[in-house]
């Protein structure tokens, strides 16, 4: 292989520019697992976490008296990644049409999760042996056949591999979770990645949270650049859907937090029952250890397929106790046909050169362990042992997402080889060109246009013809058989047109050992009907207080941000969760108050008619004649009209009644007061006319009284005419004065005109009171001055009391106040002026004579 050039100084600079760990290239060097063939694919896998001193072994937590700073774990289930590659290569070799009867081999190394060991493994693939000699091909029979490399499992491992392979332009396919950072590193060749539509993943998580109404959640991400991007994107998506975080923590894969900080971190995990974790198994490995150490349980963990928690080597039920009931999202994978059968057939004697199967078998079947780093004794293992017999906590027969990526990566390389070899065959019919493996860099054009694309700042779709993306949702639950498994409970479909569909069978979901029902994950209890949310200062928007809706507003849903104002013609019920139609209110004839007022008005009107009839019958009696019969008739008729006009105030207000009732009231009352004023004036003028030498005649006094009545009434008519011509009364509604009622009332239009009418009546009444008061001592048996004085006092008292009562009342009460004022003042005039005369007419009419009258 003549790929190696004079890049040794550059290789050394790149590999050692960061002090990752004190690791020597020769420390525990492995020869790798090699299978010869015409073309060889390199594989760099991670089967063990060694971050320092032993903390946790396969049986669980070893020492619970303190928290170690380092962790150790054999990830036995990650051996499935290697088997997926072996299975894919064997399957390809069985099909002569893919590689034109050429075979495909592999060269595999375990780099754990150590970045320097990943660099060593990369150089071992280029050098042909381990420990490697940088920039030198020790085994050209191996290195000349290398066409591509698959690895690593994380971003940091992939970067170290890429730093070496990119110098020699060897294609690298990373099976790590998609990371935009891999495409932005300053290096010659970025690794190829399997695309992952993170927008679909975040949308799926959000829709799941909304489905269960989980709006108060925690978020845990790895403390690296990828975690920063996760945190930024998923936070933005969740906040836009009304979901907020109880906490957002970053977890380092190295020991950078002391015990106090870890205790504080564990306390924060108890703030909410639902925790979202976005990251891979290795980057979040430490949090698993501390959750078990602090015995934190009862949380619902929402994860992605990258955090394949069942791969961790713990004793039976230990993982399920703390993480059971969790939900995980995985991009839909087609089942690899024949892979489970292949796993059942895997045995050490079938693959005697597999250096990894020995450790796996000894762990799964209880064989003697590694002896002095050299010897293995598998004689005590089950001779016919099968991986399918192992429980879930030890081995998983289901294809993991990582295994699926490795399998797909092998086929992507095989497809690229097929296309490259096809070009050779077209140019050379003798097939001599197929004798040598193609140079690795020649596969780049085919990998770029195939299912895998170069990683850039934008994610590449695996299949550009398929716009819809489907995610499977799994629930980690315990089966009736006593084993634990990931059970598919739903799926989420997302396409480029933003069409989303979440289907979930929540009836088969279990929530672990500590919960029997769906957990409630909210910061504040839901605000019931009739209450709205108000923010709590210093807390996220999901934390709120519930306050009752103000008057006139309702909340007909739970957790309303603002109450809804009822329409003007409706009002809220007592619970303030529904708007009810307001009741139309006016002083109706059927109302008890309306009935009483109607009866009173009719009775008083009839009573005034009876007095009028009495006066007509006894019109020739001295007392009737002495008090000016015509004015008495006019006054009684006007009072009867006053009683009758009050009936127009009762009933639903209409345009005609609103206009006529105040106008008629004003004019009729002006006639009444003018007639009383004329009567008072006659009393005074009569005594002056009978004095010796007076120029006044009784006929002149009578004509003058008629003029007073006409003049007083005409002025009121003019005031009413101006009122009607400018701003007349009209029917109106009052929706706000009384709760739950719409008051139908007559708006007086011009308030000034209304009070001018009342003021003019007050002026006439005051003038009558003044004249009557001055004439009260005139010597006459039929002198009306005293009764008029008393009647005017009653009249003025009623209407003076009317003004404040009228202004302070609303609706039916306001109308009733005016009706009572009309009836009371009219009844006062009727009683004070005419009842004494009726008494005289009916009981003492015989004792009066004209002679006595003139005395």
Swiss-Prot record:
MF (Gene Ontology): G protein-coupled olfactory receptor activity
Membrane topology note: Multi-pass membrane protein
Signal peptide region: 1-22
PROSITE patterns: G_PROTEIN_RECEP_F3_3, G_PROTEIN_RECEP_F3_4
Residues with attached carbohydrate: 101, 295
Transmembrane segments: 596-616, 631-651, 663-683, 707-727, 754-774, 787-807, 815-835
Expressing tissues: Expressed in the basal epithelium of the vomeronasal organ. Located to vomeronasal sensory neurons that project their axons to six to ten glomeruli that reside in globally conserved areas within the caudal accessory olfactory bulb (AOB).
The keyword DNA-binding is annotated on this UniProt entry: no
Matching CDD domains: 7tmC_V2R_pheromone, PBP1_pheromone_receptor
GO biological process: neuron differentiation; response to pheromone
UniProt entry keywords in alphabetical sequence: Cell membrane, G-protein coupled receptor, Glycoprotein, Membrane, Pheromone response, Receptor, Signal, Transducer, Transmembrane, Transmembrane helix
GO cellular component terms, semicolon-separated: plasma membrane
Domain of life where this protein originates: Eukaryota
Pfam family for this entry, one: NCD3G
Topological domains annotated Extracellular: 23-595, 652-662, 728-753, 808-814
Membrane topology (Cytoplasmic): 617-630, 684-706, 775-786, 836-855
Subcellular localization(s) per the UniProt record: Cell membrane
Family, as annotated: Belongs to the G-protein coupled receptor 3 family.
PANTHER family, sorted: CALCIUM-SENSING RECEPTOR-RELATED, VOMERONASAL 2, RECEPTOR 19-RELATED
Cited function: Putative pheromone receptor.
Stated name of the protein: Vomeronasal type-2 receptor 26
Organism in which the protein naturally occurs: Mus musculus (Mouse)
Lineage: Eukaryota, Metazoa, Chordata, Craniata, Vertebrata
Name of the gene: Vmn2r26
